[in-house]
């Protein structure tokens, strides 16, 4: 942990600078009105102009039209729904699968209350939150990769 050096307010050079208004906030320019009125709108409008320009010049293709007579063998959701899809696919009771899905955000909501006595922001000094994050990330990756495989290899990822 570093040592913070406090200014010596009895130093005559520092007192002279503070008297002139040259304190810690002397360098730079203020955010109001320069940034908020002039720079931010230019950046926002420039970003919108780039997006509109790319959409006009290079429109993305929607894809081939749907054929109701050619249904794929296995319908997969979007990639960000793979872990949830895997839970619903592997749990035999659908009500239990829905309860498992609801328990994930409910469990995440309890983590701040478990560590409310710990005021550190460093993740290595917050073991409960770090453990929940690491286990949750590993489980989401495991379920997400398993959702892309056939049902008989989905839980073992074809490794065992």
Curated annotation (Swiss-Prot):
Thylakoid found in the keyword field: yes
SUPFAM superfamilies: a domain/subunit of cytochrome bc1 complex (Ubiquinol-cytochrome c reductase)
Gene Ontology biological process terms, A to Z: photosynthetic electron transport chain
UniProt GO cellular component terms: chloroplast; chloroplast thylakoid; chloroplast thylakoid membrane; plastid; thylakoid
GO molecular function, one term: oxidoreductase activity
This protein's UniProt keywords: Chloroplast, Electron transport, Membrane, Photosynthesis, Plastid, Thylakoid, Transmembrane, Transmembrane helix, Transport
TM helices/strands, residue ranges: 36-56, 95-115, 131-151
Subcellular location: Plastid, Chloroplast thylakoid membrane
Keyword Nucleotide-binding: no
Superkingdom, natural source: Eukaryota
Membrane-topology annotation of the record: Multi-pass membrane protein
HAMAP family per record: Cytb6_f_subIV (MF_01344)
Family to which the UniProt record says this protein belongs: Belongs to the cytochrome b family. PetD subfamily.
Assembly and oligomerization: The 4 large subunits of the cytochrome b6-f complex are cytochrome b6, subunit IV (17 kDa polypeptide, petD), cytochrome f and the Rieske protein, while the 4 small subunits are petG, petL, petM and petN. The complex functions as a dimer.
Purpose of the protein: Component of the cytochrome b6-f complex, which mediates electron transfer between photosystem II (PSII) and photosystem I (PSI), cyclic electron flow around PSI, and state transitions.
Protein name, UniProt field: Cytochrome b6-f complex subunit 4
Taxonomic path: Eukaryota, Viridiplantae, Streptophyta, Embryophyta, Tracheophyta
